[in-house]
Every structure is written in C-alpha cells, then in structure tokens.
Amino acid sequence: MDLARPLETLTASERLEKSLTAAAADIKDYAIPFEQLLDFTREKYQPISLKKPEADWPLTLSKQLAILRLYLERGQILPAATLMREWIVSALCWQFGLPVQISENREKAEATINALTTPNPSWEPPCKEEFLELDCAPQIQNLWSQLREVRNTL
C-alpha cells in the first residue's frame, strides 16, 4: 500500500485478493477466528484491485481515487499528495486523448499544469488550449498549486 506506483498497487491488490480467496477454505476450516480478518482485508483491498489497469483508464483512475481515500483515512499525507499529483497528470493525459503511460505525454501534461500555475511562465505550455477547454480547469489549477505547497512543506 505504501507504493508510490499506483498501477503496481492496483495489480498487487488483485494478487492479494486471489491469495485471500485461495486461503479462505483453509481459514474457514482450521482458523475460524481469522475468518473475520480475512473478510476485513478483502473488504478494504477489493475496491483497489484491478488486474489490467492499462486496459481501462476511467476505471483505473477511479480505483486510484479509492487508494487515495485509503491513504487519507490512514493519515498518510505524503503518499496521498504524491498519488494525487500523479493522478492529475494521468487524468489530464486521458482527457487530452494522449496515451497515459508514455512518459513524453505525462511530461506534456505536467508541463502544462506547471506553466498554468506559475506566474509569468517563460514557456508556452504544450497542451494549453486543451487544458483551458476543461470546465474544471480553474479547480485543477487551484488543487495543483495546493499540492505543490503540501509537497514542499513535507
């Protein structure tokens, strides 16, 4: 759960769920007190479980928000802030129609949001027009600025 790589967290949760299912019969027969723990663990990690995150980006982004909620519930502010920044970049790539996992696309999305939250940037953001067309552009800019402050504080 402490991974800063959200796609790996999703697939690790998928593997955990399979392991829990495989162990369920033995636990039920031989370790009855642990059955509740098994159910609790499954309940916590099932919402963030995804076998192939790259296959469905809207679902992947939704699952990453579930990971973010878990971080916040546990008071893990730094991983939450890190994930939220990565999530915004991924969501922007997807919104711009750019393949999310290609690093050049992620750099374009991040450069755009950085430039648009920096007073008088010295460069023209690569996806400025696409970003400004988003209804939620002002909210994203505000959130990005706040996340920058959180990251710098931590």
Labelled PLM ranges:
Residues M1-A55:
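Long, charge-rich alpha-helical interaction segments
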Residues R15, P33-Q36, F40, K63, ...:
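Exposed alpha-helical structural elements
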Residues P53, L72, D135-C136:
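Residue-level detector of alpha-helix boundaries and kinks
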Residues D56-N114:
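Amphipathic alpha-helical interface elements
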Residues S90, W94, P119, L147-L154:
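Hydrophobic alpha-helical segments
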Residues F96-I140:
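Short, charged amphipathic alpha-helical segments flanked by flexible coils
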Residues L134-L154:
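Histidine-centered, metal-coordinating catalytic motifs and their short helical/loop contexts
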